[in-house]
Amino acid sequence: MGHISRHQCLIYEGSPSRHLPALVSVIQEKLRQNNRCLYLNSPPMVAGLRSYLFAAGVDVPKEVMKGRLVLSSDNTHLANGTFDVDRMLKMLSAAVIQARDEGYQGLWATGDMSWEFGSEKNLPKLLEYEWRLEELFHTLPTLAGICQYHRDTLPADIVRQGLARHQSLFINDTLSRLNPHYVRRECFDTHLDNIADLDSTINSLCNGHNQLLN
């Protein structure tokens, strides 16, 4: 029987703010467990998460000042507007090591792929990133996080590949599930055979019908 991976995927459609309450609950729990929490997204989404954290009782200025909470819309991982896989992974690896050296249990990170990739929608680069990110999760056991895929802003092929590249799916703050469509790292490819099944699962995730994943 498999176990829930530390490298999870959230696929959604509609307003991104719908998932902020669930992410806030996860962040609160990770902070209680002495993890540093990193949230990467656009300036409006960072502001929105900050408001939801305040409403949930999190002392955001205090947590940010301490370095326990990092809310960032910095896009230095983009090179001339283009997603730089090496730069992004080096930044993430350094953040994990820094968190450990500063006494944290680990680093929990989440980012929206639409923001992380900028205007570029490069499928081969996405596959390279997710494959190497999965390797990083295996190398750094104190790293955990959620890759967010917004169906409304990403090409269908990228959303399908995002689904296939994650062993576990984030449903909400109390539920994650094993992914029946997970493709092992050594089998990563741009070609997917089960398009209809993938689309059915994506529809179920976006509509909140997680029971269909059994």
For each predicted feature, which ranges?
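Non-catalytic regulatory/interaction regions at protein termini and inter-domain linkers
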Residues: M1-L213
